[in-house]
């Protein structure tokens, strides 16, 4: 699902505008699979699929495959709909340089929620 972020995000002008100040690479770990998400001026330029030997990223969000599957449901249950709720329960971790993450929090949350649109189509 993460690999579809470029097409999902880059077709959403409001989301691009919200993230226009973010120029970073962040890591998303879904179970054992790592993804590097490259963002430039709010556009997802590409998503690299790991494994990586020594990945360079600014911040990372990690969770089990089951946790991400629940998060990406078109209508997630309460608590499964928010990165911080899942971090609070220990089901996700957020690490690295949190300044760009927090400065662009709504953008990052909306980007990572975009795969929910795919759940509607299945």
What are these regions (language model features)?
Residues 1-122:
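Feature captures hydrophobic
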């Amino acid at each position: 699902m993460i690999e579809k972020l470029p097409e999902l995000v880059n077709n959403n002008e409001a989301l691009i505008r919200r993230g226009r100040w973010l120029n970073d690479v962040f890591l998303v770990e879904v179970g054992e699979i790592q993804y590097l998400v490259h963002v430039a001026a709010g556009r997802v330029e590409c998503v690299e699929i790991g494994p990586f030997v020594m990945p360079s990223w600014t911040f990372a969000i990690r969770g089990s495959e089951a946790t991400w599957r629940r998060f990406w449901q078109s209508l997630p249950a309460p608590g499964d709909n928010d990165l911080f709720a899942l971090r609070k329960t220990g089901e996700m971790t957020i690490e690295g340089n949190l300044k760009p993450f927090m400065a662009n929090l709504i953008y990052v949350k909306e980007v990572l929620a975009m795969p929910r649109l795919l759940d509607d189509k299945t």
